[in-house]
């Protein structure tokens, strides 16, 4: 199994903080937020290589960071991938980036664990990985607990087996408080469909769009994430994450 960390966006909503620094390299509780993600992955046996896909603007920054981080997590194997984009206007999009890495690194024969570099989890993801490895496709789900709040996310409903039965991005009339979040496991059977999805002219941005397309073609399982999940999309959530993870670091 290999892993892809999505870190190629330009985070325009966080300007000016992200004008000269990639969002996943912004500090949360004293360290780059991407390290919170990777420290979590460091506990999983069987992850061969972690591919961090970024853009041309920030590739050198990520490479410098990776060179230093590698000393502290020597058991992890990293590769920084430049998707070639130079601005928000010519970005490949998250699904485009996934396909770019799969194609360039010949990963079609490997199961993939995919996570956004700006999604933070307060608890271990080991349970997700163990569960997901027994499926063709699994997406992490989080109960936001509020019908108004869920309108900002990809909203799902599931059956008694945890299989997605409905998926709607930012619904006006949500039918549950479950959000599909940017943590995915795809087996080799599913990875081959990423190219099919893009070739049909579907939206290359927002990784949840692929799940929305996939669940009508294959059973997509869900795994409910416990603890705290934060999608860093604004200065407010960045500040909230800093407070939460400072408390966690003290424990």
Model regions and ranges:
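A structural signal for short hydrophobic beta-strand segments in well-ordered beta-sheet cores
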Residues: 25, 156-158, 222
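Conserved donor-nucleotide/metal-binding helix-loop-beta segment in metal-dependent transferases, i.e.
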Residues: 123-150
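Catalytic-core segments of class I nucleotidyltransferases/pyrophosphorylases
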Residues: 129-130, 160-231, 235-251
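N-terminal nucleotide-binding beta1-loop-alpha1 segment
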Residues: 1-20, 25-26, 77-78, 219
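Active-site metal-binding loops of divalent metal-dependent hydrolases
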Residues: 10, 118-119
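Conserved N-terminal catalytic core of the sugar/cofactor nucleotidyltransferase
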Residues: 2-5, 13, 31-115
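Short alpha-helix within the catalytic core of nucleotide-sugar-dependent glycosyltransferases
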Residues: 38-39, 63, 122-133, 191
């Amino acid at each position: 199994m290999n892993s892809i960390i999505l870190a190629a966006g330009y985070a325009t909503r966080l300007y000016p903080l992200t004008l000269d620094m990639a969002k996943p390299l912004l500090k949360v509780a004293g360290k780059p937020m991407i390290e919170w993600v990777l420290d979590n992955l460091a506990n999983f046996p069987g992850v061969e290589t972690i591919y961090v896909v970024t853009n041309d603007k920030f590739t050198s920054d990520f490479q410098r960071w990776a060179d230093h981080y590698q000393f502290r997590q020597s058991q992890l194997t990293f590769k920084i991938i430049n998707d070639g984009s130079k601005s928000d206007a010519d970005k490949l999009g998250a699904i485009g980036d996934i396909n770019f890495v799969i194609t360039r690194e010949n990963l079609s024969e490997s199961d993939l664990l995919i996570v956004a570099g700006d999604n933070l989890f307060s608890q271990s993801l080991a349970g997700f990985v163990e569960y997901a490895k027994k499926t063709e496709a699994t997406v992490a789900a989080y109960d936001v607990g509020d019908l108004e709040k869920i309108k900002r996310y990809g909203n799902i409903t599931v059956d008694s087996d945890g299989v997605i039965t409905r998926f709607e991005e930012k619904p006006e009339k949500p039918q549950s408080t479950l959000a599909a979040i940017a943590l995915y496991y795809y087996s080799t059977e599913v990875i081959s469909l990423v190219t099919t999805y893009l070739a049909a002219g579907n939206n290359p941005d927002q990784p949840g769009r692929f799940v929305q397309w996939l669940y009508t073609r294959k059973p997509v399982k869900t795994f409910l994430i416990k603890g705290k999940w934060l999608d860093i999309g604004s200065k407010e959530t960045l500040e909230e994450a800093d407070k939460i993870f400072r408390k966690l670091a003290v424990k």
